[in-house]
Amino acid sequence: MRFDVVTLFPAIFDGYLTQSLLDKAIVRGLVEIQRHNLRDWAEDTPHRKVDDRPFGGGPGMLLQVEPTVTCVRDVDAMADVPARKILLTPQGRRLDQRLAEDLATSDRIMLMCGRYEGFDQRVLDILQPEEISIGDFVLNGGEVAAMTIIDAVVRLLPGVLGDEQSSLDDSFSRGNRMLEFPQYTRPREFEGHTVPDVLLSGDHAAIAAWRAEQSRARTIDRRRDLLPEHSKNNPEQTNKLS
């Protein structure tokens, strides 16, 4: 899979791309991540200016349509496979595990990171990108949201995780749409808190049953909206999860 990230601040990604599983995935050729500085497409060459004040007044600056559209088209042409274009915005579809799984089936994704007051509306009208949000809050720019999408998607690619079962058991995942069960490691006891006996029994069927029960109980307590029967009784929620 290839990611192309369009951003005003490509250096923000320096540390992120050289750590942990993502770095290993890049080294092993499982994923390619290219960063593109939008300022390289600035028409105002001396100052590399790609923003201007909004028509009608108001605070802040908008990213201009000309350099953005040209940049996205040029970047799209850098590889044979057309990119799935995604614009990061708090107004977009909420990122969830199902969407991450869908994105993981793509061969190439372009992430458009906004700044300031966002993009000129004509960027959306002309390029028709998917709009994705990581939550009902506002960030200084789309870079952190882009990292979130990359992280959520890359871990789903074959070969990235040491054990493919790991992603299936995660909360919200295709192997378990509910919240994940509690997990324990050594020591068996700490300050009076002990590991449940069933996890030490070696009885795999009993362990699986305990985990399923705990997963459901935790979901009922914390996220009842994730329960299948809740979705059936709430068509609007079902549509969101489909």
Swiss-Prot record:
Chief subcellular location: cytoplasm
Cellular location(s): Cytoplasm
UniProt region (Disordered), positions on chain: 223-242
Keyword check for Methyltransferase: yes
Presence of keyword Cytoplasm: yes
Basic and acidic residues composition bias: residue spans: 223-233
BP term (GO), one: tRNA N1-guanine methylation
Positions that bind S-adenosyl-L-methionine: G114, I134, G135, D136, F137, V138, L139
MF terms in GO: tRNA (guanine(37)-N1)-methyltransferase activity
Pfam families named among the record's database cross-references: tRNA_m1G_MT
Catalysed reactions listed for this entry: guanosine(37) in tRNA + S-adenosyl-L-methionine = N(1)-methylguanosine(37) in tRNA + S-adenosyl-L-homocysteine + H(+)
Signal peptide, first to last residue: none
GO terms for cellular component: cytosol
Record-listed E.C. numbers: 2.1.1.228
Keyword annotations: Cytoplasm, Methyltransferase, S-adenosyl-L-methionine, Transferase, tRNA processing
SUBUNIT field: Homodimer.
Biological function: Specifically methylates guanosine-37 in various tRNAs.
Record family assignment: Belongs to the RNA methyltransferase TrmD family.
Annotated protein name in UniProt: tRNA (guanine-N(1)-)-methyltransferase
Species assigned in the record: Rhodopirellula baltica (strain DSM 10527 / NCIMB 13988 / SH1)
